[in-house]
Amino acid sequence: MSIKAEEISSLIKQQLEHYDDKLDINEVGVVTYVGDGIARAHGLDDVLSGELLKFDNGSFGIAQNLESNDVGIIILGQFDNIREGDRVQRTGRIMEVPVGDALIGRVVNPLGQPVDGLGEIKSDKTRPIEAKAPGVMDRQSVNQPLQTGIKAIDALVPIGRGQRELIIGDRKTGKTSLAIDTILNQKGQDVICIYVAIGQKESTVRTQVETLKRFGAMDYTIVVEAGPSEPAPMLYIAPYAGTAMGEEFMYNGKDVLIVFDDLSKQAVAYRELSLLLRRPPGREAYPGDVFYLHSRLLERSAKLSDKLGGGSLTALPIIQTEAGDISAYIPTNVISITDGQIFLQSDLFFAGTRPAIDAGNSVSRVGGNAQIKAMKKVAGTLRTDLTAYRELESFAQFGSDLDQATQAKLNRGQRTVEVLKQPLHDPIPVEKQVLILYALTHGYLDAIPVEDISRFQNELFDNFDSSHADLLKTIRETGKLPDDKELSAAIEEFSESFTPSEK
């Protein structure tokens, strides 16, 4: 067999023509320590802060601490099978989660993976969990109400679309119930809801999901769940993952409501990670940037300008207090970031006033601009009346000789408290809220015994549904009160036919 020089030279020329001098470089580090949800790796000299890293076993982590000798990594998911000496490599991207309509009606973990046993989520879109908040000129003032269906909130501390309203109170005062009822009331309102459960017991989350399913609310809700058995990094990233899912809808011109239940547990998880990464502790052992932890999250909630589609992301963060102390570190931080707070008091809760909203300490700084005119008119004096009643109530127990005006204020106050009570999972449409508050503020309830107020309200609603639906329609569609004489006459007619219970 003879070797021809021409053939060899043509083969070499062919190879040279297709030669590619691009090198595929993977920067790989070695794990030097692993434990409690964090790892340290040596050799990742060019890694970026917040970059996603991949371990040999397929797990992912986020570069959190960039030090001279090694990198501190928080591990996403299980870390039992990561060993010292394992390799970890850069991915060149930051953490992203799947987003879009495919997630609606599903229960997912903070990585966007389904945990409801309903199969794979087919979503081809992703968003980074950390994103820049909309700028000053990208926003507009809150001008559209987000009705919660809860009389005490819609009348006293109204919430607008794009607002951040904190729900704060001790454990077992009804914080989660308020948020769930608000989600239930969004049915038919064209609002997408996201419930982020951070460190909540698996059984509790299961109960909430069943409630949402029972009332048909899972048709427009995404549940993001990071249970107490999950490693701390999962609890830390859960609110950011939920916000990224909400932003996808917001930037497409839709209205979104997101509930963080609760941010106290996220702060505790972040403190745990920071101490394990040996960051210097500050007040209450929280790291120095714990304020930024929550501010960069909540600033992403906004009412976008019309130029950007006019979508909104309304946030209801929940914070748990100890013995009603709202002056602790995390509560004061979040109060200063949000646009108002709903303060729930255990004394009121155990006295049977539910929802246990403390009108004196609760405030909505921007929601008043979004409140409908009819509600603004009927609820105008409600807060001051309620505060005055609370003061009078404490004085009244010391003596029985009260003048007529004081007695009238006490009677009105008792009826106000009774009207604002509301059973669980029973949101009331805004037009019916306006109706009962109109009856209250115009004195139609003054002669009704306190124990009959609830029955009076239900029968009044039924009466208007059957005989005066046009008046309710006017309030619902225009946001204004109908003709004063007509409304008063209808309520008066019903009041005269109402029979109080026999004692």
Swiss-Prot record:
One of its GO terms (molecular function) is ADP binding. It is an enzyme of class 7 (translocase). ATP binds at G169, D170, R171, K172, T173, G174, K175, T176. It is found in: Cell membrane. Increases 2-fold following exposure to low pH. Gene3D superfamilies: 2.40.30.20, ATP synthase alpha/beta chain, C-terminal domain, P-loop containing nucleotide triphosphate hydrolases. One of its GO terms (cellular component) is plasma membrane. InterPro entries: ATP_synth_asu-like_sf, ATP_synth_asu_C, ATP_synth_asu_C_sf, ATP_synth_F1_a_nt-bd_dom, ATP_synth_F1_asu, ATPase_a/bsu_AS, ATPase_F1/V1/A1_a/bsu_N, ATPase_F1/V1/A1_a/bsu_N_sf. Its EC number is 7.1.2.2. It is a peripheral membrane protein. The record marks S362 as: Required for activity. It holds the Pfam family ATP-synt_ab_C. It catalyses: ATP + H2O + 4 H(+)(in) = ADP + phosphate + 5 H(+)(out). Induction: By low pH. Disulfide bonds: none annotated. F-type ATPases have 2 components, CF(1) - the catalytic core - and CF(0) - the membrane proton channel. CF(1) has five subunits: alpha(3), beta(3), gamma(1), delta(1), epsilon(1). CF(0) has three main subunits: a(1), b(2) and c(9-12). The alpha and beta chains form an alternating ring which encloses part of the gamma chain. CF(1) is attached to CF(0) by a central stalk formed by the gamma and epsilon chains, while a peripheral stalk is formed by the delta and b chains. NCBIfam families: atpA, PRK13343.1. Belongs to the ATPase alpha/beta chains family. Produces ATP from ADP in the presence of a proton gradient across the membrane. The alpha chain is a regulatory subunit. PANTHER family: ATP SYNTHASE SUBUNIT ALPHA, MITOCHONDRIAL. This is ATP synthase subunit alpha.
